[in-house]
Curated annotation (Swiss-Prot):
Gene3D superfamilies: 3.30.70.1710. This is Bacterial microcompartment shell protein PduU. Bacterial microcompartments (BMC) 100-200 nm in cross section are formed during aerobic growth on minimal 1,2-PD-B12 or anaerobic growth on 1,2-PD-tetrathionate medium, but not during aerobic growth on glucose, anerobic growth on glucose or pyruvate-tetrathionate. BMCs can constitute up to 10% of total cell protein. Homohexamer with a central pore lined by a beta-barrel. Hexamers pack into a loose array. Interacts with PduV, probably via the beta-barrel which is predicted by modeling to be on the exterior of the BMC. Keywords: Bacterial microcompartment, Transport. Artificial BMCs can be made in E.coli by expressing pduA-pduB/B'-pduT-pduU-pduN-pduJ-pduK (in this order). Enzymes can be targeted to the BMC, and appear to be encapsulated within it.
Length: 116
């Protein structure tokens, strides 16, 4: 009797840690990007955050809006996605405040803020 090859089976499970996995500033985005995202194009910057656990995105929006003149463009409390809008310096400062507060006060692992 010939031996059949076996297939290894792997089960993967998503276990989120406390982390900010993306913090990005888009300075002076094109009007098409605003249109595709459903945002008003009267601002000069978009900030993007991805956070786990996703409920912390609510805290991030609270920190960001209290830090200065930014508005919440999008918040998904189920995926942890946050989009902020405002002028470049306000959005940059908001991203810094969010990553600093989550990192220092709540012991999240944070990433560097990137910019395009």
């Amino acid at each position: 009797m010939e031996r059949q090859p076996t297939t290894d089976r792997m089960i993967q499970e998503y276990v989120p840690g406390k982390q900010v996995t993306l913090a990005h500033l888009i300075a002076n985005p094109g009007k098409d990007l605003f249109k595709k995202l459903g945002l008003q194009d009267a601002v000069s910057a978009i900030g993007i955050l991805t956070i786990t656990p996703s409920e912390a995105s609510i805290i991030a929006c609270d920190i960001a809006t209290k830090s200065g003149a930014v508005e919440i463009g999008f918040l998904d409390r189920f995926t942890g996605a946050v989009v902020l809008t405002g002028d470049v310096s306000a959005v940059e400062y908001a991203l810094k405040q969010v990553t600093r507060t989550l990192g220092e006060m709540m012991q999240f692992t944070t990433c560097s803020i990137t910019r395009t």
